[in-house]
Curated annotation (Swiss-Prot):
This is Uncharacterized protein C2A9.02. GO terms for biological process: cellular detoxification. One of its GO terms (cellular component) is cytoplasm. Pfam families: Epimerase. SUPFAM superfamilies: NAD(P)-binding Rossmann-fold domains. It comes from Schizosaccharomyces pombe (strain 972 / ATCC 24843) (Fission yeast). Belongs to the NAD(P)-dependent epimerase/dehydratase family. One of its GO terms (molecular function) is aldehyde dehydrogenase (NAD+) activity. InterPro entries: Epimerase_deHydtase, NAD(P)-bd_dom_sf, NAD(P)-dependent_oxidoreduct.
Length: 295
């Protein structure tokens, strides 16, 4: 198949591109710059210059292809709600092109749309009300599943790890370096699920090839890692004290990260593994943190 990939130059998207090409697919990748276009060409893909905001150009690219994997997202947490609204508009535009074609569309969401109260979330768990902003993209995706699009959702955990990661864990490491301590909130027993980037990319490819319209998949290799353990490994690697901060102190210490660090989001992928035959095999988060990939 000829697959249109948004975020093709990203941390996860670039690995998806590699695996799609390895599986014999053609890739047309949405990229913003000539620099990223050159990288995509070198990998064997075809660059398509555009942005998420330019929906007309995006739709023309989608129309050339047999399916879509949408991973791009504006990761600017100062405008998070607007980024989620843009994500929904992008999915709407893609869905309009694919409507009635029975072509596959895999969109990206997050496990945090599920409850953050420590209850194990599954692929069939109900989303709590009111939903978080990221749920907008899920609602839009599922709408097209009943309109002749093989649309499904792949939820990523807060920690998609591996060499080149620049998300929450590297941010925590930078906070620890700047503060001289590695901290967690309260007793630190709230959990984040995790997955290695290579395993996550593999799930996108499997979902593209095997998915059923309206499905939700979880790219989760580890159901829940206590934040205290993550902070402990960071402290060990940086040779700095590991401390607890109160919820009142958390915002001053972590900034915007405090709201994410307070989430208790254990998540299962048992149904995903059963339905798609997905088996995560790569290193765990703590193994990666013990290596030189992050330090």
């Amino acid at each position: 198949m000829r697959i249109f990939v948004t975020g093709a130059a990203g941390f996860i998207g670039s690995e998806i591109v590699r695996q799609l090409l390895e599986a014999g697919h053609e890739v047309v990748g949405l990229v913003r710059s000539e620099e990223n276009a050159a990288k995509l060409r070198a990998a064997g893909g075809t660059p398509y210059i555009g942005t998420l905001e330019d929906l007309d150009t995006l739709k023309k690219g989608v129309a050339q292809c047999d399916g879509v994997i949408h991973t791009a997202f504006v990761h600017d947490f100062s405008i998070y709600q607007e980024a989620c609204k843009l994500d929904a508009r992008v999915i709407e535009a893609i869905g309009e092109v694919l409507r009635g074609t029975e072509r596959p569309l895999i969109t990206t969401s997050v496990t945090a749309v599920l409850s953050s109260n420590g209850k194990l979330g599954t692929e069939i768990s109900e989303v709590p009300q009111p939903p978080i902003p990221r749920q907008l993209g899920e609602v839009t995706t599922l709408k097209f599943a009943s309109q002749g699009v093989r649309a499904s959702i792949l939820r990523l955990p807060p920690t998609v790890h591996g060499a080149g990661d620049h998300a929450f864990v590297p941010m925590l490491i930078n906070v620890a370096k700047n503060k001289g301590v590695s901290a967690y909130i309260g007793n630190g027993m709230n959990c984040w699920p995790a997955v290695h980037r290579t395993d996550a990319a593999n799930l996108f490819v499997l979902a593209l090839e095997k998915e059923t319209a309206g499905s939700i998949y979880h790219a989760v290799a580890e159901e829940g890692i206590p934040i205290k353990e993550i902070a402990g490994m960071i402290g060990k690697r940086l040779d700095i004290p590991v401390i607890s901060v109160s919820s009142e102190e958390a915002t001053e210490h972590f900034g915007f990260l405090s709201s994410f660090l307070s989430v208790d989001n254990p998540t299962s992928s048992i149904l995903t593994q059963q339905r798609l035959g997905w088996k995560p095999t790569h290193s765990t988060l703590m193994t990666d943190l013990a290596s030189d990939a992050y330090f």
